Amino acid sequence: MKVMKLKSCFWLIGLLLVCNVYAQELCRADFLPKASAAFDLLTQKYSEERIVKEIRAKNVRWVTNLMSASAVFYKATHEKRYLDMSEQVFGNAIREWKKNEKLMHGKDDFFALQNLALAYEILQDNDRLPMGADEVMIRFADLHFDPDFVIDNNQGQERALGFVRMCNLFPDAPGVSHWKEYVDKMWHFWYRNKDVDETATLYASIHLNDIINIAIESDKVA
């Protein structure tokens, strides 16, 4: 009996050592090349024609996700092709939205503003913004502003994060006081509960990530 217990202990110790080795390897692993390869695979069929088509189809979520994702990949890899992609998508969107602001609204566009603002910020840091972008950005934010959209899920938090970023980018915008008021309302609505109410893992992670970014980017944490 003692021998069996001793063997079990050795097996457990061995298993823990193996897990520890794999955990250390996981911590040292560089996932960026794999992420870049996956992004390249997903965007291999993107083109100027496709971009304009999606903008005119009011696929605001697709357009803003692509411009921000490519900008983030540039920031992570410093590969110029990602910055070029972000500039191309952003520039086309600004041009088309300027001609027809009805194209600024589309399905699930509650995701749009925070991605648009993120792309703007990275392009601004690299002197890649097109002429007239500021006016379109502010108009886009105003058209998506809904002070009564107070809800504790990823849709509400995505909107709030977008307005946090707009407040930081355009502190002198005419509607900035209303944007800030909305952000504070959303923050306090969530803070009373201090929980993520989403049941789906993906949406829960989006919600939690937004809460962290709102707290950091609006100086709600020291």
Predicted segments with their positions:
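Extracellular ectodomain segments of secreted/surface proteins
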Residues: 45-57
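Bacterial N-terminal signal peptides that target proteins for export
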Residues: 1-11
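Bacterial N-terminal signal peptides
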Residues: 11-20
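Non-catalytic all-alpha helical scaffold/repeat segments
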Residues: 36-47, 82-91
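Short amphipathic alpha-helical segments that mediate assembly, nucleic-acid/protein binding
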Residues: 28, 35, 48, 133-134
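Boundary at the C-terminal end of the N-terminal hydrophobic targeting segment
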Residues: 21-25, 29
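Aromatic-lined, polymer-binding surfaces characteristic
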Residues: 54-222
